[in-house]
Amino acid sequence: MARWSVWRSPVMLPRSWIEELTASGMRCSSSMPVIRQAYSESSSIVRPFSEIPGLWKNGLANLYNFWKLDGFRNLHRIMLQNFNTFGPIYREKIGYYESVNIINPEDAAILFKAEGHYPKRLKVEAWTSYRDYRNRKYGVLLKNGEEWRSNRVILNKEVISLKMLENFVPLLDDVGQDFVARVHKKIQRSVYSTHCAGSAPFLCLSFTLSFAAVSSVLYGERLGLMLDYIDPEAQHFIDCITLMFKTTSPMLYIPPSLLRQIGAKVWRDHVEAWDGIFNQADRCIQNIYRQLRQETGSPKRYPGILASLLMLDKLSIEDIKASVTELMAGGVDTTSITLLWTLYELARHPTLQEELRAEVVAARAESQGDMQEMLKRIPLVKGALKETLRLHPVAVSLQRYIAEDIIIQNYHIPAGTLVQLGLHAMGRDPKVFFRPEQYQPSRWLRTETHYFRSLGFGFGPRQCLGRRIAETEMQIFLIHMLENFRVEKQRHVEVQSTFELILLPDKPIILTLKPIQASR
């Protein structure tokens, strides 16, 4: 049975934090036992906001202690430890960032019911500061209020509606086929009959796969995925996205305006990263716009999301550019890392891998090779992706500023408060998931309720706009990988997560890909 290092090596709280806990009447030992409740479950008395347990009285001191704990990389572990210490709800303030944190699915339901007509999540100050600095429009990811809603309704029809899948699937299937063809070619060129997946070249390949997939859907043409080399512009774009995420994390707790004033390197690097992202997106958008103006009549094939939005003519060009750029930036690291985690788990569970492969082979035969039909016949593959997002979520938490007063765990929380649902912590909570440390895709096939337990893409009208693209891309990728390769891992190498705005592997995931024919 796999054991998670977060249980082996709990994050130790600084003495000043322990003193604050003691002063508030909570018991805290050096071994940080699982308390799971700091309240009376039988009590029906609603307690005031000021009595929510946690570390919220001194934001600057907490920021210093957070830094000492290397919290910029260990946020997910610290959140998990806080839930173990304070129970299913706690309040914290780190620097100028203040929130209430919850973990139970039932409390998540209360939270999302209180998100209001215009759901508002955590404002990523670093991203909005860059756009203000460069005088760029906000996309739908960063907008709020009526402008967000009107833009989102239009984008939903072209991006996330189920009927659009028939347009996306052929494009994503082509990318998946070319990807495995490239891996086969690399194996044939090597002196071995296997391919080491986890070295820098393979990671570049996986990032490039996601870049090619999202660009195919957005622009109707593929960018960056070549059979013999990786396009330098595509690689630069990927590098910029990685740098953007890495430099965002420190600015969650320190105002970007302050870092800009003092000329901090993290701010300069952040600007450089976003400049590269927008420059690449601008070139792609300009090319498509130019092609549309030169063409006459309706396109003979699906032209991509960008062209569809331009022809629809319901959003300004600047609004379209802003949201398409966000989709581009959000569609590379996130999906490629989830796929890499899935391959890692399948390599750790070879029997399960064979079950998924058998399902894919049967689906191929039953659907006669029709990919859209195949996607309806792979419940275990879909369960594997859900299980990956449970154990290795891209985001540490989901956030909402509540539009009305609510009561959670018998505590009153006033309207306007930022409330976070701990995704990473919930996925490891034995009160929510049976044997949470085990990778069991079949848990998602059972008849018991999954009420507010699968939230890897968010929930409600503010869920991930690129959800359909990401889900379909990952399902098709796994189909092709399972049909072509057996995946194995190095023995005795356990990989954990590190926080860089999104959760990433803390060390290279080293896998071996063996072509199916060669391994028989």
What are these regions (language model features)?
Residues 1-49:
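N-terminal mitochondrial targeting presequence
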Residues 34-70, 74-171, 175, 202, ...:
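Cytochrome P450 substrate-recognition site 1
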Residues 65-87, 279, 283, 370-409, ...:
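Conserved cytochrome P450 K-helix E-x-x-R motif and the immediately C-terminal K′/meander segment
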Residues 81, 486, 502-520:
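C-terminal helix/juxtamembrane-tail motif
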Residues 124-128, 166-339:
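Cytochrome P450 heme-thiolate monooxygenase catalytic core
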Residues 210, 214, 277-282, 307-361, ...:
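Central I-helix of cytochrome P450 enzymes
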Residues 350-352, 467-504, 508:
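Cytochrome P450 heme-binding "Cys pocket" and the immediately downstream C-terminal segment
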Residues 421-447:
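Conserved cytochrome P450 K-helix/beta-meander segment immediately N-terminal to the heme-binding cysteine loop
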